[in-house]
Amino acid sequence: MTRPLIGIVVLSLVAATLWAADTDKRPQREQAFAAKLTGATMTGAFSLDGKQDKNQKEDKYQIVSAKKTEGDNWVITAKMKIGENELDVPIAIKVYWADDTPVMSLTDFTIPGLGTFTARVMFYGDRYAGTWQHGEAGGHMWGLIGKTPEKK
């Protein structure tokens, strides 16, 4: 009876130590994630459910800035073209961590004039991949992250 109890205590201590070590790295990971997205362009493609092979579309997002606010909350400011105007639109978003991998979570976010969006997007290295929903339409998205060239 004592032997299993000792094993459980040892495993608990190891798990607590690993969790503490991971928590210690979180601020550096968050800073690196903010730096990667600030001034970046995400270039890739997206698909529509049921039409993956037929309707793969080119996709591009320009990120002006990425800032952590409090807890899991971030503000991602993206350039968006609405009609003839190009605007910097701040989007309140949650970022959760799966080990060293950030995952953006956006649920039922309404952008006036564009509609309501839900997305889950994972970032690793210079790649991103995820799912999206806009009203009745939804699908997958994926691509590469690179720095936005400066305008001359």
Residue ranges and their predicted role:
Residues 7-16:
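Bacterial N-terminal signal peptides
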Residues 18-20:
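Boundary at the C-terminal end of the N-terminal hydrophobic targeting segment
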Residues 22-24:
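Short linear interaction motifs
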Residues 26-30, 36, 40-152:
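Central antiparallel beta-sheet cores of small beta-barrel/beta-sandwich binding domains
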Residues 1-4:
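Positively charged n-region of N-terminal signal peptides that target proteins for export
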